[in-house]
Amino acid sequence: MATCFAITASFAQGPGFHVINTFHIPSAGRWDYIAVSPVTDNIYVSHQTQVNILNKNTGDSVGVIPNTTGVHGIAFAPSFKKGFTSNGKLNTVTVFDIKTNAVQGEIKTGENPDAIMYDPYSKKVYTCNGKSKDLSVIDPATNTVVKTIELGGKPETAVSDEAGKLYINIEDKNEIAVVNTKTFVVERRWKIGKGDEPSGLAIDLKTKRLFAGCGNKLLIVVNAENGNVVKELPIGDGCDGVGFDAGLKYVYSSNGEGTLTVIKEKSANDFEVLENAPTKKGARTIAVDEKTHKIYLPTADFAAKQDPKQKRPDMMPGSFQILEVGK
């Protein structure tokens, strides 16, 4: 089990969002998504072969979920008292107890399950399978896959309107696919204007607006009722996650360049980019705690590239960390 500790940021507090704490996790491995538990004070972060669990108030290590090689995401089904991890290298989902974190089983899925989410309307868990280009639909009551939905493209992230529709970013098609969660049929495919390689996706359930973060430094606002592009907004480079705080009406884009783009939703059709708050290079995925209005971003320290052709810089050993961001 990795030991974690918190360091308070030493720089002066600015007028906007800033790093409040840094929670260090000295074990090795890269990461992907992070999630906030809806029933405890824990945050869960994917960490290559395991999921690290931290107390969000102190940064202390609570435990790990082991044997999740290639883990991407974490989802929670509170009514079933279960959590789920998507294990990309294993083509499986690990099921765990939402309070004790004890592993309860493993489910075979499509190839390379990436993002994972629970839809309270259909009472199903969905994995976005990047290699097989489909969704695995899991019944948490039985821990079985009950349907596979072909998407015809690489799914990146999915969100629900909690009223019978699922929206999925199709990264290699620059579109959003709309799935009926009663029939499990793809009903529509919407192009997203100038957006290229959509990754992060969030939704405002009240205004029925989708927020798609794209690889070409744009966030596309889409009407979830008809697919019309409402707004194209500038964001930082390297977005791989989008979060939404329904209470504050803030949309967040976590950018690998080391910034957090903060956008205010003034109304369903009126948006303003407030700032690109400094975070840290590599902080590209995000979890928003709507209870505390804090934001969590995993990243690490990196060595300088030895070869210009090197795709990613080497991660410094023992430097994995979670940034806590707020006002």
Question: How would you describe each model-predicted region?
Answer:
Residues M1-A9:
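Bacterial N-terminal signal peptides
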Residues A9-K327:
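Predominantly soluble domains enriched in secretory-pathway, periplasmic, or organellar proteins
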